[in-house]
């Protein structure tokens, strides 16, 4: 079954509100064909459609979806692709403000841990897809799924590394153990001003097709109807790409 919800690091439950602040403050016309422009980086509608297609293809190939994918599921998956970009910008800015550097080695360590964990989760199925597909499929199977496409797993790993760095920095300043669940409220209090500051500094424009800011809930809510309908050709292309990667081994 296809799900889509926030990042895995459970201690950071303030993320949704901070992202909402970031998206609500940015207006102006969208560039033609753009799904979002985050920190000057343009993501096209076509890119988002391809990402959604790859998720649908992956879950259908592995028999996770009963029946057709609904408009609500498509909308959630499309919004999830944009949310990941906003999360990346937010946590990158927070890390920059704190003077923290997250290296490619940090990203690789995070991604390696994800792959090891998720391949173990899929082990009973003898999953033979790529490492990125393994992470995306395990995500799709979980009840706390974030709508990962295989192609966005490296971005997701980078976000996790950024979150870990910022959380650990704030925990050290407050003399708290970040792994102790009893410290979650205090960590939330420490993180809130850092994220609010970062949210006010990043530049985000999101096409209303993917949702809007709901001031009453401080959340970015998806559009009621989904216009994201990957064509049969797009889904077939995603399937062919996955089959080709399976034949080449993991990566």
Residue map of PLM features:
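Short, mixed-charge aromatic SLiMs
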Residues: 106-123, 181-206
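A broadly tuned, weak detector of single residues within folded domains
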Residues: 19, 33, 88, 154-155, ...
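Proteostasis/folding factors centered on peptidyl-prolyl cis-trans isomerases
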Residues: 126-174, 179, 192, 205-209, ...
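Alpha-helical transmembrane segments of integral membrane proteins
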Residues: 8-11, 79, 155
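Short, low-structural-confidence N-terminal segments
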Residues: 1-73, 189-251
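Well-structured core secondary-structure elements of compact alpha/beta domains
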Residues: 50-77, 152-185
């Amino acid at each position: 079954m296809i799900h889509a919800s926030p990042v895995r690091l459970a201690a950071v439950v303030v993320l949704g509100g901070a992202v909402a602040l970031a998206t609500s403050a940015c207006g102006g016309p969208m560039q033609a064909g753009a799904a979002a422009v985050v920190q000057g980086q343009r993501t096209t509608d076509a890119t988002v459609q391809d990402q959604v297609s790859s998720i649908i293809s992956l879950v259908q190939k592995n028999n996770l979806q009963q029946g057709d994918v609904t408009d609500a599921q498509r909308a959630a998956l499309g919004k999830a692709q944009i949310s990941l970009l906003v999360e990346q910008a937010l946590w990158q800015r927070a890390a920059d403000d704190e003077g923290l550097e997250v290296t490619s080695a940090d990203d690789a360590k995070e991604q390696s841990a994800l792959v090891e964990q998720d391949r173990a989760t899929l082990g009973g199925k003898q999953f033979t897809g790529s490492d990125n597909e393994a992470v995306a499929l395990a995500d799709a199977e979980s009840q706390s799924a974030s709508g990962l496409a295989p192609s966005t797993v490296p971005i997701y790993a980078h976000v996790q590394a950024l979150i870990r760095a910022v959380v650990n920095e704030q925990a050290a300043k407050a003399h708290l153990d970040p792994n102790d669940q009893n410290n979650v409220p205090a960590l939330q209090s420490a993180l809130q001003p850092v994220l609010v500051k970062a949210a006010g500094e990043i530049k985000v424009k999101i096409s209303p097709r993917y949702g809007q800011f709901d001031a009453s809930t401080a959340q970015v809510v998806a559009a009621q109807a989904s216009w994201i309908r990957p064509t049969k050709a797009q889904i077939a292309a995603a399937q062919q790409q996955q089959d080709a990667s399976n034949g080449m081994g993991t990566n």
